[in-house]
Amino acid sequence: WDDMEKIWHHTFYNELRVAPEELPVLLTEAPLNPKANREKMTQIMFETFNMPAMYVAIQAVLSLYASGRTTGIVMDSGDGVSHGVPVYEGYALPHAIVRLDLAGRELTNYLMKILTERGYSFTTTAEREIVRDIKEKLCYEALDFEQEMSTAAASTSLEKSYELPDGQVITIGNERFRCPEALFQPSFLGMEACGIHETTYNSIMKCDVDIRKDLYANTVMSGGTTMYPGIADRMQKEITALAPSTIKIKIIAPPERKYSVWIGGSILASLSTFQQMW
C-alpha cells in the first residue's frame, strides 16, 4: 500500500499538478476486488490526500460505458489477468464473473521462449521490454491457426523484421500469431485454463437465461491484450461455434479499447445524474 500511495502522490503532484483536496476522485478497481482493498483505498484518499469526495467503479463496467452501452459482457485483458464480466443495466453480475490468469505478461514470456527457439536470446528485464515491444508491434491473431501455420511454412509472406536497439535486425515469422494464439489455446503455455472465448461463453452461461441474448449481441473487448489485429474476427468465429446457432453474436472492439476504462470513467464522472453519487 505504501507503494500505491507513492504512485498516487506522484500522479496528483507531479503528473496532474492538482490539489487533491479540491477535486473529487474516481478510482477504478478490478472485478471481485475484496471489500478490504476498497476500504483501504478509501481511507488513503480521505486521510492522506484529504479528498472531498470519491467513487470506486469496476473497470469492466467503465469499458462498457465507453462503448455506449449499459448491458453487455466485457472481456477485459490487461497485463496480469483477464476477466469475463457480464453487466446488466450498469451493474456487474458478481456471481457470473469469470477470471482467467492469462494476460499480456504470460504472452510476453511465451514470445521470449519461442524466439529463443529461433536462436535469439532474450533473458534480462531490459530484453523483456524489447520482446513486449515486438509483441505489440508485430503480433496478430490468426483466424484459422492451422491454415496460418501452413501458410507460414510454405512462404515468407508472413515474415517481418524488427530492429533491436543495438542495430541488429531479427526476423519473426509464425511467432507473430503463435504468441497470441495462447489466448485461445492456453495449453500452449502449459495451462489447463479455458481460452478467452470459452471464458466469455462460461460467463454468459452463468447468467440468467433471459439476458444471454443481450450479452451475446454486446460482447465488448477491452484492455491492452485485446489489441491484436484480427482478434475480434477470431472471437466472433469461436463464440459462434460455442453458442446456439440462432443467436446473433456481435463483438465490439473499439480502436481505443486499450484506454476504454479511462474513457468510461471520464464519461461517468461528467454525467449530471452522477454528481450525487460521489
UniProtKB/Swiss-Prot annotation:
Enzyme class, first EC level, given as a word: hydrolase
Protein name, entry field: Actin
GO cellular component, as recorded: cytoplasm; cytoskeleton
Catalytic activity entry: ATP + H2O = ADP + phosphate + H(+)
Organism, scientific name: Calanus finmarchicus (Calanus tonsus)
E.C. code: 3.6.4.-
Keyword terms of this UniProt record: ATP-binding, Cytoplasm, Cytoskeleton, Hydrolase, Nucleotide-binding
Subcellular location per the Swiss-Prot or TrEMBL entry: Cytoplasm, Cytoskeleton
InterPro entries: Actin, Actin/actin-like_CS, ATPase_NBD
Family: Belongs to the actin family.
GO molecular function annotation: ATP binding; hydrolase activity
Pfam families in the record: Actin
Superkingdom of origin organism: Eukaryota
Function: Actins are highly conserved proteins that are involved in various types of cell motility and are ubiquitously expressed in all eukaryotic cells.
